[in-house]
């Protein structure tokens, strides 16, 4: 009887040892083998291409392949679409759902954001793919990368709200103040 008891206990211990073998925490890796960007993992922004729209709406073909219609809330007092609406342009939209419809809290025309921007102390180019190049050698802490995260523009380590994005003007605001840039050549 003791042999059966010890035999069953040894089988139980072996089962526990083998079942715990693979319980080490695994590092979070993307399919490409790179560590996931902690900033992009909590991004609530919807990215896509505008396929149609009107005065108060944008129909967006998202990067996931979905087609979504976003409306401008008639109660909004501020302009929620920054950079204009042109079919075929890339957009970053922060939205919310109300009464079964998708509404825009903010929409940034990424195509309008690309290009050369300059001010008295900065002269830079925002390029596709998240890179920024600076034209001034004397510039302190030049921006080298950009991304949109939760409706905010991140230039290297600086985070900005886009106050205005027009054909020739870009106004950015953060805790240090408002920065106005004009379209360069």
Annotate each language-model stretch with its function.
Residues 1-5, 22:
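Positively charged n-region of N-terminal signal peptides that target proteins for export
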Residues 5-13:
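Sec-dependent signal peptide hydrophobic core
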Residues 16-19:
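C-terminal motif of bacterial Sec signal peptides marking the signal peptidase cleavage site
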Residues 21-47, 52-185:
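Lipid interaction determinants
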